[in-house]
C-alpha cells in the first residue's frame, strides 16, 4: 500500500494483480480493442492473454506519440497488434481470428486451469485419436536430423486428437499445450526443432501454468 498509494488508478490495479498472482489466483485477459499506456500492463501481467487479429493492440504509447517523439509514422497494428505480440514479442499467448474465437479460447484457458488437487483429478471418457497411431512410423523420419512437425505425433497420441496449444506462434521450436490421454488431463512439452531463447521462455511460462 505504501508503494502504490492511489485507490482508483493504475497503481492500485498493478498492486492487486501482483498480489493475486502471488496467491495463485488465475488471471486471463482477453484484449478486444486498445490497451494503451497503463492498460497495456494488464494483459502483460496476466497468466494468459488473448488478442484478436487486426482488432487488438497493446502498447505504452500510440502512433501519435511515437510520431511526436521520433518522427516515425507507424500503424497501430504494426506497433502493437496481435501479430507482433503473439508471434514476435510473446506478450500475448493466444491468437484469435475474431471476438467469438477469442471467447472460445478464453473458455479453453479456464477449463485448463490447474486448480484441482491431484487426488481430485477428473477423468474424462476415453476417446481414441482421430488419427491412427500406427501411422507414427511414417510421421517420424528414420533420419532424426530430418525435421518434422511434432504436432502430427501429438495428434496420434492424445484423446480425440484434441490439443489446446499454448503460444502457438511464438517460440515455434517448442510445442506446448493441454490435452487428455486415456481420459486424464496432461500438459505436453514437445521439441519441434532447434531450441532458441523464445522457446525456453515459452516453456517456462507453460510449466508455471501446468
Q: Which positions does each model-derived feature cover?
A:
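Gly-rich Lys/Arg/Thr-decorated short loops/hinges at beta-loop-alpha junctions or inter-strand turns
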Residues: 1, 24, 67, 85-87, ...
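Conserved catalytic cores of soluble enzyme domains
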Residues: 1-118
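Generic, ordered loop/turn and secondary-structure boundary motif
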Residues: 5, 14, 59-61, 66-70, ...
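Short hydrophobic/aromatic-rich motifs at helix boundaries and adjacent loops
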Residues: 11-12, 54-55, 125-126, 178-180
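Generic detector of short, locally flexible boundary/turn motifs and exposed helical patches
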Residues: 15-17, 51-52, 58-61, 141-146, ...
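Short C-terminal domain-edge/linker segments immediately following a structured domain
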Residues: 81-83, 125-127, 209
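Terminal amphipathic helices with adjacent charged low-complexity linkers/tails
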Residues: 94-154
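Non-catalytic terminal/interface segments that mediate subunit docking, oligomerization
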Residues: 145-210
